[in-house]
């Protein structure tokens, strides 16, 4: 188990109700999502003296904190767990990339409509469903739809040029409308209608129509057709059965607030098409003496009215608190959405159950947060005592990441009195240095960070340098050379050298670039907060470096051809049906693409061949 995670204290705050839990590492990255019929019993099983597998043992060692979401039923917990896995891609569940966008599913207006992912403006003729929380969610939905309703998903350029059905037809995931005689117009239209109803949340209508068709086929002695429709009914039921949904299938956001010990937790439950898509807890800073109604009012205004184009307004917002200016806020949200948005504070029926669920989760999240904050306060006080400082209000930590000196990225993470201040985490692209020179990289990032005017509240009490005497000496040299108006002597520079075999708990701390360092006991709270900020900085640097490296790696040859911009690339790929067909095309075939001259076609042909 992670040394910085107090399992015993955490388990005291956990309920025995069904729900979903998310486990985080030191970098606040979700590393595992699970569901349980009894959250307390399930989570307690991770912290026994003997765990079930090596995977579980490795997982538990990485845990820094855990969030839980309570649900009505275990089935709902399972569905919510699936949404969270798609959203967070935890490394102990799956390894998928998240596009961090809000894509939609597009059902085209073609004679034989196709299903596809869509992003951006809605210019194409057809129907749009969504938005979905991320790219993985929409792709998983398309795969599911393909299994339930075999509507084509191929590009029009591929569809128009087929003379025989593709593999998707062979495995039963497309009806093959590209080839005459494989499917009737009526049968294909019926499957498209099922897709339309299913994506609109009208699952029962889909089932009713399928049951009617199955009974009709059976009466007409078309038993093979009846069996096929029966299998389709069972597949749809497996997806939709037992989920707790609001009866009308509308889009709702359910917001509840909990307040204790000077801290507020605003919990938002997201419901789309009557289904729970996910939830999130927010902890706004609340000045002393603020009324809870004002907290909710301010939060709702900031949450929906600050120009976040990726966030869509629901049809209805449910609140557990009466707002002072409810009518004004309703009018503002309606104007922004371009349609009626309602705010309800006294719902009934299913809506009341959702609000009760949000209240429970808000209270649970607040208890967990207060417990974590208490631990952070104790650790910072212990570190201040070790460093002989009166107190620590702000810490910053730096780390460098690169691969063989390439794509060097420096990270800066910030802790305040309550722990990680992620809104102030920063990454710096390092350039103009000898590849692999970590000292020069550290000097550059420190100069860029501190060689400018700083507000007093932004001056750190402690600056942690991930490195030994050499890196600390570099940092001290930079600070000696600073020509700034703020007190450059205020921050205490602390070097952290990794122990033998890079094992946690064996770190050596340096306050001076010369002389001996000091080691703290492995169970020292002061060491734990140093490890926490150091690990956060390390993860933040690696994350930035990987993105930078992937960007370079994923730059295709097509992007490097002069005269081929984003629009022409898109036209080429759509017309040819992808990069591989384009690479296999002749000059004449490339020249047939709209907007591509013969001369440019030659240039593209030779660039792709060589």
From Swiss-Prot:
Domain GIY-YIG: 16-94
Record keyword DNA damage present: yes
Annotated function: The UvrABC repair system catalyzes the recognition and processing of DNA lesions. UvrC both incises the 5' and 3' sides of the lesion. The N-terminal half is responsible for the 3' incision and the C-terminal half is responsible for the 5' incision.
InterPro entries: GIY-YIG_endonuc (IPR000305), GIY-YIG_endonuc_sf (IPR035901), GIY-YIG_UvrC_Cho (IPR047296), Hlx-hairpin-Hlx_DNA-bd_motif (IPR003583), RuvA_2-like (IPR010994), UVR_dom (IPR001943), UVR_dom_sf (IPR036876), UvrABC_protein_C (IPR050066)
Lineage of the species this protein comes from: Bacteria, Pseudomonadati, Pseudomonadota, Gammaproteobacteria, Enterobacterales
Pfam families in the record: GIY-YIG, HHH_5, UVR, UvrC_RNaseH, UvrC_RNaseH_dom
Subunit and interaction comment: Interacts with UvrB in an incision complex.
SMART domains for the chain: GIYc, HhH1
Keywords linked to the UniProt accession: Cytoplasm, DNA damage, DNA excision, DNA repair, Excision nuclease, SOS response
Gene Ontology terms describing biological process: nucleotide-excision repair; SOS response
Domain of life, per lineage: Bacteria
Family under the similarity heading: Belongs to the UvrC family.
Domain UVR: 204-239
GO cellular component term, pick one: cytoplasm
Location(s) in or outside the cell: Cytoplasm
Protein name from the UniProt record: UvrABC system protein C
One annotated GO molecular function: DNA binding
